[in-house]
Structures are given as structure tokens and as C-alpha cells.
UniProtKB/Swiss-Prot annotation:
ATP binds at residues 21, 179-181, 259, 265-266, 282, 286. K(+) binds at residue 49. The gene is metK. Its cofactor is Mg(2+); K(+). Its EC number is 2.5.1.6. Catalyzes the formation of S-adenosylmethionine (AdoMet) from methionine and ATP. The overall synthetic reaction is composed of two sequential steps, AdoMet formation and the subsequent tripolyphosphate hydrolysis which occurs prior to release of AdoMet from the enzyme. It comes from Corynebacterium aurimucosum (strain ATCC 700975 / DSM 44827 / CIP 107346 / CN-1). This is S-adenosylmethionine synthase. It comes from the Bacteria. Its main location: cytoplasm.
Length: 407
């Protein structure tokens, strides 16, 4: 650790992985299947899990739909798009085995979603029809550390991973293979403001003939320095920033041949890089009737609008549901002492209740979630994306929140 690191109040680290990481392959396949089913049937109920290992892809889960899709074809297409096109790179989407074991959604779960507790008790209103697909708690978070209202560490890690994939696919850095990871450590001061980029770690799969010295120079120039300029990180990136590229040495064997992968095993990468709490539910392969996904998106929507409205510098929002019930059983707002203009967290929570309807049917309608938009979220994060447009990143409710808070 450097002297400067020792003087920092805290060091905070976040990681990202590329789309060729085994777990992210699984997320991509599950979301590609989900998108294909939603294209056929917007009301489809989908819960699809994927496992990859050497030469094999296994797809399992539960589905209720009037549509039909060719799952093996979707699996192979997704693998080829990622870059697994030959056994030489550790996996071949053209020839791998694909095993599918998908059953019908439980009728009891389906009944609770289709007719909520409120409907069955005769006390329902508009948007009370659909109950939550499961119990659970979901968090959303936003901060003014970056223009996209995301924590700087996870934003930077994703930026590096996206660039690493770009230079591979475009041939800017030849001899790279799909699997890869990035990690960044930032120093924060006593006011929780990032001050320095302390360490960058990049591990990337590559062809056998590559030397680590050549690879380090290429990635320093075409990935690290490019991202520093593109993301305007020069105030954090200094001559003291430690750069570790493939610190364990060669990385030839990767992808599913190196490690088995599963859907839903990168939930911190998918969200806020550990800067905020997580309810535990994964996203990929789940249709929006599953509040694990839709309510987590809604919480990001709420938190981002709180910060965009200038009500706080940071906001974390929790919501909770009971299976089969439309109305949330809990809502909580935390601003970590950063609320503005004399507001309390309770004031902001009251404003949120006035502006946002957090029943599942309302979330699905307001964010237009019954459409094939999920494959693009399977890698590089579900939040704060600058490369794709996602409805939960909209901040048009900021003015409504200010009015509801009396500002």
C-alpha cells in the first residue's frame, strides 16, 4: 500500500467482468431466451436458468407462454455473438451440447400473480390486479459522484470491461479472447468524496503466443488510458496509480473450459459494485412479473430521481413485497445525512409515496417492461448505462419529487 493510500480515510473497490466470463455467458443466454419469449408473448412468465461447463450448456426453468422459440438456436447464436466460435478459445457455440429442461410455471404461483390478494378479497383498485411474483426486498441506489448518478468505482470498472471487449472485437488489440475481469480501487476522503484511483486490475484471456509485457503495454494504451480520457478520470489517475495486468501470469484457458458458469452469480457486478445493499435476488432470465427484477429497476428509478431532483447527494431506497399481494409491505429511504434544503429522510419518503406507484402492475406499465430489452443488460451492469437507453434511468420525475417535497 502506498503512503497516500495509508492516509486515505478509506479505500473502496468494485469489479466488473466481460461478457465472456462464464457467469455472464449464462446471464446473456437466459436474457436472450427471455427476450425471444417476450417478442412472441409480452405476457409470458419466464424463469430461465443457464449452466455452462466444458462443451455443454444446460438450460432449465419454468415458463408459461403462448409463444414458442427455438432455445438451442438462441443459445448458439448468443455464444457466437460473445466470441466463443472455436474450441481453440475454449468453447465453440456451433458444436457444443445444448440440453433443455424447461417445465410449466407452478399454477399456484401463477394464480397469485394473475389475481392478487386484493382481487381475491374484493378490495382491489386499478393496478391492484397483479400480485408480486414472490416475497422479497429490493434496493435501489444513486449518488452524484458521476454524471450517470452511479458510484465511481463500479462505473469505472464497467467502462474498462466494455472497452476491453471493444478492443477485442474490433481487433484493436489482437490475440485477445472473450473471458476477462476488471477491478478498481478508489481512495475516499473524510467527506466520502473520491480523491484518487489507487489500483486498476485487468485480467484478460489471450492467445498462447502473447507475451505479458506486450499485453500490458497494449492494454495500458488502448484500454486504461483510453477510458481515463473518455470518462474524464485524469484527476484521479496519476503516476502513483498501480496498474496490474494479468497479475497471475498467462490466462489462456478461460470461459466455460476454465470455470463453470451459472445465471445470477454476479449480482454485485450487476448493481452498484458493493456500494449499496442488495436484496439477494438476481435479474437475468426473469420476466417483469418477478419483483426481484422489476422492483429493483423501480428502486433505481426512484433513487436516481431523488438525487437528480437535488433532494440528496446519495439515496438508497428499499421496497418489500409479499407474494400474491400488489401493494408493497414496506418502503424505506436512506440518504446517509446528505438530504438537502432542510429535508429529512421521512420527508423524501413521503414525496416518493406521492410520486411513484410501486405496485407491480404500475411498475411494469410505467417502465414498459413487457418488451425484449433485457439481453443488453446481461453484461456491464443494469444501472447507469451510457451505451444503451433503459427506462429506469429516466429522471423526468425529478420535478414532481421537488414539488411533492414542497420545494
Amino acid at each position: 500500500m502506498t503512503d497516500k493510500a495509508a492516509q486515505a480515510v478509506r479505500l473502496f473497490t468494485s469489479e466488473s467482468v466481460t461478457e465472456g466470463h462464464p457467469d455472464k455467458i449464462c446471464d446473456a443466454i437466459s436474457d436472450a431466451i427471455l427476450d425471444a419469449l417476450l417478442e412472441e408473448d409480452p405476457d409470458a412468465h419466464v424463469a430461465v436458468e443457464t449452466l455452462v461447463t466444458t462443451g455443454q450448456v444446460h438450460v432449465v426453468g419454468e415458463v408459461r407462454t403462448s409463444g414458442y422459440v427455438e432455445i438451442p438456436q438462441i443459445v448458439r447464436k448468443t455464444l457466437v455473438e460473445i466470441g466463443f466460435t472455436s474450441s481453440d478459445v475454449g468453447f465453440d457455440g456451433h458444436t457444443c451440447g445444448v440440453n433443455v429442461a424447461i417445465g410449466e410455471q407452478s399454477q399456484e404461483i401463477g394464480a397469485g400473480v394473475d389475481a392478487s390478494t386484493e382481487v381475491r378479497s374484493g378490495t382491489f383498485e386499478d393496478d391492484d390486479q397483479y400480485g408480486a411474483g414472490d416475497q422479497g426486498l429490493m434496493f435501489g441506489y444513486a449518488t452524484n459522484e458521476t454524471p450517470e448518478f452511479m458510484p465511481l468505482p463500479i462505473s469505472t470498472a464497467h467502462h474498462l470491461s466494455r472497452r476491453l471487449t471493444h478492443v477485442r472485437k474490433e481487433g484493436i488489440v489482437p490475440s485477445l479472447r472473450p473471458d476477462g475481469k476488471t477491478q478498481v480501487t478508489f481512495a475516499y476522503d473524510e467527506n466520502d468524496v473520491p480523491t484518487r484511483l489507487e489500483t486498476i486490475v485487468i485480467s484478460t484471456q489471450h492467445d498462447p503466443e502473447v507475451t505479458q509485457e506486450w499485453l500490458a503495454e497494449q492494454l495500458r494504451t488502448h484500454v486504461v488510458e483510453w477510458v481515463v480520457n473518455d470518462a474524464d478520470l485524469s484527476q484521479y489517475y496519476t503516476e502513483d496509480t498501480e496498474l496490474l495486468i494479468n497479475p497471475s501470469g498467462s490466462f489462456i484457458l478461460g470461459g466455460p473450459m476454465g470455470d463453470a458458469g451459472l445465471t445470477g452469480r454476479k449480482i454485485i457486478v450487476d448493481t452498484y459494485g458493493g456500494m449499496a445493499r442488495h436484496g439477494g435476488g438476481a435479474f437475468s432470465g426473469k420476466d417483469p412479473s418477478k419483483v426481484d427484477r422489476s422492483a429493483a429497476y423501480a428502486m433505481r428509478w426512484v433513487a436516481k430521481n431523488i438525487v437528480a431532483a437535488g433532494l440528496a447527494d446519495r439515496a438508497e431506497v428499499q421496497v418489500a413485497y409479499a407474494i400474491g399481494r400488489a401493494k408493497p409491505v414496506g418502503l424505506y429511504v436512506e440518504t446517509f445525512g446528505t438530504a438537502h434544503e432542510g429535508l429529512s429522510d421521512a420527508d423524501i419518503q413521503a414525496a416518493v409515496n406521492k410520486v411513484f406507484d410501486l405496485r407491480p402492475a404500475a411498475i411494469i406499465r410505467e417502465l414498459d417492461l413487457q418488451r425484449p430489452i433485457y439481453r443488453q443488460t446481461a453484461a456491464y451492469g443494469h444501472f447507469g448505462r451510457t451505451d444503451v437507453e433503459l427506462p429506469w434511468e429516466d429522471t423526468s420525475r425529478a420535478d414532481d419529487l421537488r414539488r411533492a417535497a414542497g420545494l
